[in-house]
């Protein structure tokens, strides 16, 4: 994610960029079309790259190894101009070493996104890995059942190049050995950023460039607070150990030190006032309410999925009963 964010930030300073993941001789010839010019113009937002990087890093942390992730691309299309603005994750499973997309999950997520982003539409899909291969063709054919002429974006998180490791493709049909074969044609793209995206990407790039956050005001403030709290903890621990040792007779009493410790304790704010209790209980109630609402939302989502599956099963059984009624 660091490399992708830094490269995206660098690319936003220019007028545009083409794909950084070059297709070389290692690509299987049967999946790439040669001499084909792209039919659409693609504008890619950095938010999509950050989402894909975050998706891949989370799955790698969960699995303990690099894994391939799959998701959907959403945005706007006006004629031959396509703007990829956001993305969301997709579920998939492997059957006989072939990736199968969970279309039911996709339709659920699409409905949810339509409620929030009514102006955005499904444009294609993304995955991670090296150059395109036949397995990508297999997944692309499944996406073609959902939308006609989808885009295919591939990010290589393991690359060591300084260019943006992202390539965008479209599918074309070519006649090979007398048979119609689906191939990929690489598209050039530009990076389109909004002000909020530009600020966020610049912040991430600054944080990841040095690894210490020296250029981030927020990071410097948090580091200073952490150092102060750590020092306070060590000093309080030292005073507590001295008082315990004095009570146990391990060290002689020093009345001056004990008076200073006593005065320090009395400098602490009184936390037993009615106003503090009221504010404290209000904050606890707010936190508990937020957690409760999150649980309710999750439960509603689970119930919604259950109802959808029940309706699908009920419709299938109803069709079966009607078909049997035609023959008996």
UniProtKB/Swiss-Prot annotation:
Molecular-function GO terms, alphabetical: metallopeptidase activity
GO biological process: one example: protein deneddylation
Domain MPN: residue ranges: 42-175
Stored SMART domains: JAB_MPN
Example of a GO cellular component annotation carried by this entry: COP9 signalosome
The keyword Cytoplasm is annotated on this UniProt entry: yes
Functional note: Component of the COP9 signalosome complex (CSN), a complex involved in various cellular and developmental processes. The CSN complex is an essential regulator of the ubiquitin (Ubl) conjugation pathway by mediating the deneddylation of the cullin subunits of SCF-type E3 ligase complexes, leading to decrease the Ubl ligase activity of SCF-type complexes such as SCF, CSA or DDB2. The complex is also involved in phosphorylation of p53/TP53, c-jun/JUN, IkappaBalpha/NFKBIA, ITPK1 and IRF8, possibly via its association with CK2 and PKD kinases.
Annotated protein name in UniProt: COP9 signalosome complex subunit 6
Gene: COPS6
């Amino acid at each position: 994610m660091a490399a992708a964010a830094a490269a995206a930030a660098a690319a936003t300073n220019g007028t545009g960029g083409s794909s950084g993941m070059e297709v070389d001789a290692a690509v299987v010839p049967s999946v790439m079309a040669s001499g084909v010019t792209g039919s659409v113009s693609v504008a890619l937002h950095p938010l999509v790259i950050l989402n894909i990087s975050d998706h891949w890093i989370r799955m790698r942390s969960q699995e303990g190894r690099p894994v391939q992730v799959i998701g959907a691309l959403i945005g706007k299309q006006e004629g031959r101009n396509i703007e990829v603005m956001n993305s969301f994750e997709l579920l998939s499973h492997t059957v006989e070493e072939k990736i199968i997309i969970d279309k039911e999950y996709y339709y659920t997520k699409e409905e949810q996104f339509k409620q929030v982003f009514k102006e955005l539409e499904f444009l294609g899909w993304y995955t991670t890995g090296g150059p395109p291969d036949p397995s990508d063709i297999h997944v692309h054919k499944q996406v073609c059942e959902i939308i006609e002429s989808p885009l295919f974006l591939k990010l290589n998180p393991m690359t060591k190049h300084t260019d943006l490791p992202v390539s965008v493709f479209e599918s074309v049909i070519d006649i090979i050995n007398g048979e119609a074969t689906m191939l990929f044609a690489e598209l050039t793209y530009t990076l389109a950023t909004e002000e909020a995206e530009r600020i966020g990407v610049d912040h991430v790039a600054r944080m990841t460039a040095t690894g210490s956050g020296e250029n981030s005001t927020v990071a410097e403030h948090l580091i200073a607070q952490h150092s102060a709290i750590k020092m306070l903890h060590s000093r309080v621990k030292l005073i507590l150990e001295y008082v315990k040792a004095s009570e146990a007779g391990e060290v002689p009493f020093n009345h001056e030190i004990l008076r200073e410790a006593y005065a320090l304790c009395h400098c602490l704010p009184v936390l037993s006032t009615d106003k503090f209790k009221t504010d404290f209980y209000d904050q606890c109630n707010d936190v508990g309410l937020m957690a409760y609402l999150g649980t309710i939302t999750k439960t509603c989502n689970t119930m919604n999925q259950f109802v959808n599956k029940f309706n699908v099963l009920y419709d299938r059984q109803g069709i079966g009963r009607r078909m049997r009624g035609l023959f008996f």
